């Protein structure tokens, strides 16, 4: 193991500030070591059980590799070079990715080739990154008979337990047959034509796009977007509910949002958290986010203030692109679509009426955040957008932020301020106090590099001059007990 040792000295310290020394990252802190270096946005993401991540987006290079639209990252953010080894990926951006039960990946996007082989805009990729040619890769999506829109966009993929899946976006035909905004497919890629929530065309003056979808535990679907004319008229707009049997829930009360929906996520039982660029609802002002009850009515208890998002009263160009309830906190990301430098990544209380006192994001992105993904354990928040920095760290387009204190893998952490020696940091000096008798002191970087290895036998504080950073400190006493 490479060792970079520093001289230690013994001093008496009157008082220092407490440090959570056992945490590799503190809650709210950006993980500067997680740095894949994309040259474009991540638009969709699958979090693997082994800690790896599959990212789809509008990137053409990741690090030193020329790869378009789809890549798999290791748990530390490095590229998984075994995935699509030697391949170039798509010829254009990918908008959505989902993992099948057997470990393959469904990918949708604006592409026409994968590894230089002609494909449709929906493909299935094997676990090793190669094209699954057993899947029906020639599905044809279209937008026809519409006044202004000619080009399709596939925005969302939602898996079902039986292997079927939904695709939603900007289209109204699949293989020449009616499919307004959403279609259901069998596992082999053939369309399940029994799923047709409406037999009516999207209204010609509607903006026909689904930007957000959430599948409820009962199997029903909530769809949000810019559409203003689902089911042929203007009553079903911005946010709709599709029953588990595939029928349109026409009893779902329309909240009358004055803008578009860009994110939907669960908010406890029988409620959803909705984000977008709306400013009002039929029940009054709701700035960029609101909570909707199961029947479509507005939850009056959630009501965030405008200054949580911006100090600028000209708020028409602001939008929330991602929102999620995590414990008793609401995480929101977004910014100004006209002035990208006006961005936010905030944590509100559950009622939206104040900033959280239990979780604060330490560094703000320098440009708009357009994507949010939180792992199932609520350990990390992954964000993407137009930013190149988060706080003081250069992190182009993609970053990871800790939502709770993170302890290095393989370390059994103990809060040594309470049960043994104490470790504190102040003014460039790491001090260790409370050692009794003979002990072994080790200080490592988070990558495992030894910075200090020594035997000590002094009751006075041990002082190590170290630059500000994250360190792993281990103290093994004469009885063989180790504090980390």
Region annotations inferred by a language model:
Residues 1-25:
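Bacterial Sec-dependent N-terminal signal peptides
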Residues 6, 17, 27-28, 233, ...:
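A generic "functional-site adjacency" signal
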Residues 6, 13-14, 102, 351, ...:
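Serine/threonine-rich, low-complexity intrinsically disordered segments
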Residues 9, 227, 258, 425-426, ...:
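Short, surface-exposed loop and linker segments with low hydrophobicity and enrichment for Pro/Ser/Thr
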Residues 13-17, 99, 157, 213-215, ...:
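A generic structural signal for short, solvent-exposed coil/turn residues
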Residues 21-412:
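Extracytoplasmic mature domains of secreted or surface-exposed proteins
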Residues 414-484:
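C-terminal outer-membrane/trafficking sorting elements
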